[in-house]
């Protein structure tokens, strides 16, 4: 559920309430009332849920009442898991040059047409090209250049013969070396063309995408040291209950240890939110109201959200705002 809020802005506070297994999850809000759901202003305590809303209708309400958060700039080092605020368009080709896709020999396809194991073609070796180190001459008819994978293609060459299909020959007493080619390959074979991976003007990543580590590699390859991302929603955790002991405490008679905040806090962080949590809130309406009125984009209430005598959260929201949804039909 939290993942769906990662790229949303709550125009007014949203309050989500997490109940037990029997109760399911409850969705509460200070914001405008959804048209399909009608609630009276009666006290909801000790009378049962007036109606249970379907999960689909609840999500529709959330999507209707949320807008995109404002954006900020993030460096690539901190952008993993963030949500893109804009489409990313490439202003360059990747690669920006034709390159060899195999270790072998760059040559002219017309020179090796018809070459076989039984009838090889010999070419004059005129140099070498390495990644980042091109050869400063063009390949002429009857010539070849040894290339490594990723090396810029020499001018004039239009095919790379893999080392498995060629043999470099050194002839004693002769300064010139030759290459014996035993395969016929078409022009363009084993050659990476300009813009083959990413072309100028291409939409590389869409707005709203949650960035993965591999996306950051793509962004770096097109020269983006930083990217516009949606601000993280501030999610305030309101954990209520007089019976609760701090997380990690040993259970005592008639009291239980907080097991929800250790679960919810990392879930909020995992799904893109910044968790705000000031500790356990007692079952006191004034104390709960104080938490609900603190600045936040989303408030997640755990406990005190059903229809019991001390379930104050629904009453407070109904009194100080609106309660469009109270009770969701789910297990």
PLM feature spans:
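Short, glycine/charged-enriched hinge/interface segments at domain edges or termini
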Residues: 40-53, 106-282
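Short Gly/Pro-enriched turn/cap motifs at secondary-structure boundaries
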Residues: 95-98, 193-194, 328
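Residue-identity detector for glycine
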Residues: 19-20, 24, 104
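Extreme N-terminal basic, low-complexity initiation segments
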Residues: 2-10
């Amino acid at each position: 559920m939290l993942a769906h809020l990662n790229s949303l802005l709550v125009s007014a506070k949203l309050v989500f309430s997490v109940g037990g297994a029997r109760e399911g999850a409850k969705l509460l809000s200070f914001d405008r009332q959804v048209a399909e759901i009608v609630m009276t202003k009666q006290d909801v305590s000790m009378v049962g849920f007036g109606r249970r809303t379907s999960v689909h209708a609840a999500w529709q309400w959330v999507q209707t009442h949320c807008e995109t958060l404002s954006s900020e700039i993030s460096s690539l080092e901190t952008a993993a898991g963030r949500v893109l605020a804009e489409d990313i368009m490439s202003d360059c080709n990747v690669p920006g040059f034709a390159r060899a896709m195999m270790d072998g020999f760059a040559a002219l396809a017309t020179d090796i047409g018809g070459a076989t194991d039984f009838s090889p073609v010999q070419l004059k070796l005129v140099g070498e090209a390495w990644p980042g180190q091109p050869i400063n001459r063009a390949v002429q008819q009857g010539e070849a250049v040894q290339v490594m994978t990723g090396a810029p293609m020499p001018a004039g060459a239009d095919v790379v013969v893999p080392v498995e299909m060629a043999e470099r020959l050194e002839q004693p007493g002769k300064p010139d070396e030759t290459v014996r080619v035993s395969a016929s390959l078409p022009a363009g074979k084993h050659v990476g063309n300009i813009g083959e991976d990413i072309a100028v003007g291409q939409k590389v990543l869409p707005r709203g995408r949650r960035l993965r580590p591999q996306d950051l590699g793509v962004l770096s390859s097109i020269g983006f040291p930083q990217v516009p991302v949606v601000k993280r929603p501030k999610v305030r955790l309101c954990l209520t209950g007089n019976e609760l002991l701090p997380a990690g405490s040993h259970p005592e008679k008639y009291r239980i240890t907080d097991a929800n905040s250790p679960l919810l806090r990392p879930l909020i962080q995992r799904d893109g939110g910044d968790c705000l949590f000031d500790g356990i809130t007692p079952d006191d309406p004034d104390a709960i109201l104080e938490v609900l009125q603190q600045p936040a984009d989303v408030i997640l209430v755990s406990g005190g959200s059903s229809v019991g005598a001390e379930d104050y959260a629904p009453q407070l929201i109904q009194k100080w705002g609106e309660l469009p949804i109270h009770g969701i039909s789910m297990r």
